[in-house]
Protein backbone atom coordinates (compact mmCIF):
# COMPACT_ATOMS: atom_id res chain seq x y z
CA UNK A 1 0.00 0.00 0.00
CA UNK A 2 2.72 2.49 0.92
CA UNK A 3 4.69 1.49 -2.16
CA UNK A 4 1.71 2.41 -4.37
CA UNK A 5 1.30 5.75 -2.61
CA UNK A 6 5.00 6.54 -3.12
CA UNK A 7 4.70 5.72 -6.80
CA UNK A 8 1.67 8.03 -7.17
CA UNK A 9 3.48 10.78 -5.27
CA UNK A 10 6.47 10.53 -7.65
CA UNK A 11 4.32 10.55 -10.77
CA UNK A 12 4.99 13.68 -12.83
CA UNK A 13 2.86 12.94 -15.86
CA UNK A 14 -0.23 14.79 -14.47
CA UNK A 15 -2.55 12.17 -15.86
CA UNK A 16 -4.67 12.13 -12.72
CA UNK A 17 -5.01 15.91 -12.73
CA UNK A 18 -6.13 15.93 -16.36
CA UNK A 19 -8.70 13.20 -15.73
CA UNK A 20 -10.00 15.10 -12.72
CA UNK A 21 -10.24 18.27 -14.81
CA UNK A 22 -12.26 16.45 -17.45
CA UNK A 23 -14.64 14.75 -15.01
CA UNK A 24 -15.19 17.63 -12.55
CA UNK A 25 -17.46 19.78 -14.81
CA UNK A 26 -19.67 16.78 -15.53
CA UNK A 27 -19.94 15.94 -11.84
CA UNK A 28 -20.75 19.55 -10.95
CA UNK A 29 -23.35 19.75 -13.72
CA UNK A 30 -24.92 16.51 -12.46
CA UNK A 31 -24.92 17.79 -8.86
CA UNK A 32 -26.52 21.09 -9.89
CA UNK A 33 -29.07 19.13 -11.94
CA UNK A 34 -30.11 17.17 -8.84
CA UNK A 35 -30.37 20.40 -6.85
CA UNK A 36 -32.45 22.00 -9.65
CA UNK A 37 -34.81 19.02 -9.72
CA UNK A 38 -35.32 19.39 -5.98
CA UNK A 39 -35.89 23.15 -6.30
CA UNK A 40 -38.41 22.59 -9.12
CA UNK A 41 -40.38 20.07 -7.06
CA UNK A 42 -40.28 22.43 -4.07
CA UNK A 43 -41.53 25.34 -6.21
CA UNK A 44 -44.38 23.25 -7.65
CA UNK A 45 -45.34 22.05 -4.17
CA UNK A 46 -45.43 25.61 -2.78
CA UNK A 47 -47.53 26.84 -5.71
CA UNK A 48 -50.01 23.97 -5.34
CA UNK A 49 -50.26 24.52 -1.59
CA UNK A 50 -50.81 28.26 -2.15
CA UNK A 51 -53.79 27.57 -4.43
CA UNK A 52 -55.23 25.03 -1.99
CA UNK A 53 -55.00 27.45 0.91
CA UNK A 54 -56.20 30.30 -1.30
CA UNK A 55 -59.41 28.50 -2.25
CA UNK A 56 -60.02 27.47 1.37
CA UNK A 57 -59.71 31.14 2.31
CA UNK A 58 -61.89 32.28 -0.61
CA UNK A 59 -64.86 30.05 0.26
CA UNK A 60 -65.03 31.07 3.91
CA UNK A 61 -64.34 34.81 3.73
CA UNK A 62 -65.76 37.80 1.84
CA UNK A 63 -66.30 37.17 -1.87
CA UNK A 64 -64.08 38.93 -4.37
CA UNK A 65 -67.20 39.14 -6.57
CA UNK A 66 -68.94 41.18 -3.89
CA UNK A 67 -72.19 41.64 -5.84
CA UNK A 68 -72.70 37.89 -6.14
CA UNK A 69 -72.97 37.43 -2.38
CA UNK A 70 -75.83 39.89 -1.95
CA UNK A 71 -77.72 39.29 -5.20
CA UNK A 72 -81.17 37.72 -4.81
CA UNK A 73 -82.09 35.70 -7.90
CA UNK A 74 -85.81 36.29 -7.41
CA UNK A 75 -85.02 39.74 -8.84
CA UNK A 76 -84.16 37.98 -12.09
CA UNK A 77 -87.64 36.46 -12.29
CA UNK A 78 -86.89 33.09 -10.67
CA UNK A 79 -89.55 31.84 -8.25
CA UNK A 80 -88.68 31.56 -4.57
CA UNK A 81 -86.90 28.27 -3.88
CA UNK A 82 -86.03 27.49 -7.52
CA UNK A 83 -82.53 26.21 -8.25
CA UNK A 84 -80.27 28.65 -10.09
CA UNK A 85 -80.00 27.57 -13.76
CA UNK A 86 -77.02 28.35 -15.97
CA UNK A 87 -79.25 30.71 -17.95
CA UNK A 88 -79.43 32.95 -14.86
CA UNK A 89 -75.81 32.51 -13.73
CA UNK A 90 -72.91 31.04 -15.70
CA UNK A 91 -69.95 32.28 -13.74
CA UNK A 92 -67.69 35.17 -12.79
CA UNK A 93 -63.94 35.61 -13.30
CA UNK A 94 -62.00 37.98 -11.02
CA UNK A 95 -58.42 39.14 -11.40
CA UNK A 96 -56.37 41.84 -9.72
CA UNK A 97 -58.39 44.66 -11.31
CA UNK A 98 -62.03 43.61 -11.80
CA UNK A 99 -64.64 40.87 -11.99
CA UNK A 100 -66.42 40.01 -15.25
CA UNK A 101 -69.37 37.74 -16.03
CA UNK A 102 -68.71 34.67 -18.18
CA UNK A 103 -72.22 34.98 -19.59
CA UNK A 104 -75.60 35.80 -18.12
CA UNK A 105 -75.66 36.70 -14.48
CA UNK A 106 -75.93 39.39 -11.86
CA UNK A 107 -73.55 42.34 -11.74
CA UNK A 108 -70.50 40.79 -10.11
CA UNK A 109 -69.12 43.79 -8.23
CA UNK A 110 -65.50 43.72 -7.07
CA UNK A 111 -63.89 43.80 -3.63
CA UNK A 112 -60.25 44.84 -3.89
CA UNK A 113 -59.87 44.24 -0.15
CA UNK A 114 -61.08 40.64 -0.40
CA UNK A 115 -58.74 40.03 -3.34
CA UNK A 116 -55.76 41.57 -1.51
CA UNK A 117 -56.51 39.47 1.59
CA UNK A 118 -56.66 36.33 -0.56
CA UNK A 119 -53.32 37.09 -2.23
CA UNK A 120 -51.78 37.83 1.16
CA UNK A 121 -52.97 34.45 2.47
CA UNK A 122 -51.45 32.71 -0.55
CA UNK A 123 -48.14 34.51 0.00
CA UNK A 124 -47.76 32.72 3.34
CA UNK A 125 -47.09 29.60 1.27
CA UNK A 126 -45.44 31.09 -1.83
CA UNK A 127 -44.08 34.60 -1.16
CA UNK A 128 -43.21 35.32 -4.81
CA UNK A 129 -46.88 35.52 -5.84
CA UNK A 130 -47.93 38.85 -7.36
CA UNK A 131 -51.59 39.94 -7.57
CA UNK A 132 -51.38 39.60 -11.37
CA UNK A 133 -50.67 35.86 -10.92
CA UNK A 134 -53.98 35.14 -9.15
CA UNK A 135 -57.38 34.55 -10.79
CA UNK A 136 -60.55 33.66 -8.85
CA UNK A 137 -63.52 32.06 -10.62
CA UNK A 138 -67.06 31.55 -9.36
CA UNK A 139 -68.95 28.98 -11.48
CA UNK A 140 -72.50 27.67 -11.24
CA UNK A 141 -72.38 24.38 -9.36
CA UNK A 142 -76.13 23.71 -9.43
CA UNK A 143 -76.32 24.21 -5.67
CA UNK A 144 -78.31 26.94 -3.97
CA UNK A 145 -81.75 28.35 -4.63
CA UNK A 146 -83.39 31.67 -5.39
CA UNK A 147 -84.32 33.74 -2.37
CA UNK A 148 -82.14 31.85 0.12
CA UNK A 149 -82.67 33.74 3.39
CA UNK A 150 -79.18 32.82 4.57
CA UNK A 151 -77.57 34.11 1.34
CA UNK A 152 -75.75 33.86 -0.95
CA UNK A 153 -78.36 32.37 -3.26
CA UNK A 154 -75.83 30.45 -5.34
CA UNK A 155 -73.26 28.10 -3.80
CA UNK A 156 -70.69 28.63 -6.51
CA UNK A 157 -67.79 26.36 -7.32
CA UNK A 158 -64.84 28.60 -6.41
CA UNK A 159 -61.60 28.04 -8.31
CA UNK A 160 -58.35 29.81 -7.46
CA UNK A 161 -55.81 29.76 -10.29
CA UNK A 162 -52.15 30.67 -10.16
CA UNK A 163 -50.71 31.65 -13.54
CA UNK A 164 -47.48 33.08 -14.89
CA UNK A 165 -45.14 31.38 -12.41
CA UNK A 166 -41.62 30.90 -13.77
CA UNK A 167 -38.64 28.78 -12.72
CA UNK A 168 -34.95 29.49 -13.40
CA UNK A 169 -32.67 26.44 -13.18
CA UNK A 170 -29.16 27.06 -11.85
CA UNK A 171 -27.65 24.82 -14.53
CA UNK A 172 -28.85 27.05 -17.38
CA UNK A 173 -28.87 30.40 -15.55
CA UNK A 174 -26.40 32.11 -17.87
CA UNK A 175 -27.64 30.72 -21.17
CA UNK A 176 -31.43 30.27 -20.98
CA UNK A 177 -34.27 32.43 -19.63
CA UNK A 178 -36.63 31.11 -16.93
CA UNK A 179 -39.33 28.77 -18.18
CA UNK A 180 -43.05 29.01 -17.52
CA UNK A 181 -44.60 26.50 -15.13
CA UNK A 182 -48.08 25.16 -15.88
CA UNK A 183 -51.14 26.78 -14.35
CA UNK A 184 -52.00 25.67 -10.82
CA UNK A 185 -55.64 25.51 -9.70
CA UNK A 186 -57.74 24.31 -6.83
CA UNK A 187 -61.54 24.32 -6.46
CA UNK A 188 -64.07 23.95 -3.64
CA UNK A 189 -67.77 24.71 -3.24
CA UNK A 190 -68.63 28.06 -1.63
CA UNK A 191 -69.46 27.97 2.06
CA UNK A 192 -70.73 31.14 3.73
CA UNK A 193 -68.64 33.62 1.72
CA UNK A 194 -68.60 36.23 4.48
CA UNK A 195 -66.07 37.36 7.06
CA UNK A 196 -62.40 38.19 7.14
CA UNK A 197 -60.98 35.34 9.22
CA UNK A 198 -60.30 31.77 8.11
CA UNK A 199 -57.98 29.07 9.36
Regions found by a protein language model. Name each.
Residues 1-13:
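N-terminal leader/signal peptides at the extreme start of proteins
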Residues 39-48, 63:
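Membrane-proximal amphipathic alpha-helices
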Residues 14, 25, 127-130:
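Proline-centered flexible-loop/turn and helix-kink motifs
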Residues 12, 48-52:
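A broad detector of short, well-ordered amphipathic alpha-helices
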Residues 21-42:
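C-terminal juxtamembrane segment of a hydrophobic transmembrane alpha-helix
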Residues 2-3, 52-199:
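Short, conserved structural patches
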Amino acid sequence: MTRALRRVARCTRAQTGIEFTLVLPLLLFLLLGFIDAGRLIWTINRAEKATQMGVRYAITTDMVAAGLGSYVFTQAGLPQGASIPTTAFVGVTCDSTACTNKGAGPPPGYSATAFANLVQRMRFFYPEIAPANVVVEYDNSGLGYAGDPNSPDVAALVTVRLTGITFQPMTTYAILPPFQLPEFRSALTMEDGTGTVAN
